[in-house]
C-alpha cells in the first residue's frame, strides 16, 4: 500500500479537439490545465510502480468559492465531473504508479471542497487488490 498527496488544481480530462496541420490530424486536450495536473501526479507518484491488480482510493480537494467564507462546504455537485478528474489522474499515474490503468480493478473516488486553509489537490492511495477485497466491497455496497 502506498499513499500520497498531489498538491495543485485537479484538472478534468474532457474531449480532445481535433484539427488538421500539414495534412495530418492533430488531437489536442480541450483544457490547458490537464497537462500540468498529469505531470504533477506523475512526479509525486514516481518510483511507486505496482504490479498486479490494484484498488485505488482518491479524494479530490477542489477550491472553495468566495461565498463560502469559513462555513462548512456543502457536497460538491458542480463541475468538474468526477469521472473526468479520475481520467486525467489515472493518466498521470500510468507508467509511474502502475504500468497501465487496466490494472485498476476497483476504486473509491470522492470530490469535495477544501476546508478553510486546506490546499487543493488529490489524496491518492493505491493498494494491492485481491478477490477477498473485491468480495468485501461488493458485499458492503450491495448488501449481498
Residues covered by each model-derived region:
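Acidic, proline/glycine-enriched N-terminal capping motif
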Residues: 1-144
Amino acid at each position: 500500500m502506498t499513499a500520497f498527496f498531489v498538491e495543485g488544481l485537479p484538472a478534468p480530462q474532457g474531449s480532445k479537439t481535433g484539427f488538421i496541420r500539414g495534412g495530418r490530424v492533430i488531437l489536442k486536450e480541450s483544457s490547458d490545465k490537464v497537462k500540468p495536473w498529469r505531470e504533477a501526479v506523475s512526479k509525486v507518484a514516481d518510483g511507486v510502480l505496482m504490479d498486479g491488480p490494484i484498488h485505488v482510493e482518491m479524494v479530490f480537494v477542489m477550491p472553495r468559492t468566495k461565498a463560502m467564507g469559513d462555513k462548512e462546504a456543502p457536497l460538491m455537485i458542480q463541475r468538474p465531473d468526477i469521472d473526468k478528474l479520475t481520467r486525467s489522474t489515472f493518466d498521470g499515474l500510468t507508467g509511474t504508479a502502475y504500468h497501465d490503468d487496466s490494472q485498476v480493478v476497483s476504486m473509491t473516488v470522492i470530490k469535495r471542497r477544501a476546508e478553510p486553509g486546506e490546499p487543493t489537490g488529490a489524496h491518492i492511495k493505491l493498494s494491492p487488490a485481491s478477490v477477498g477485497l473485491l468480495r468485501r466491497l461488493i458485499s458492503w455496497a450491495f448488501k449481498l
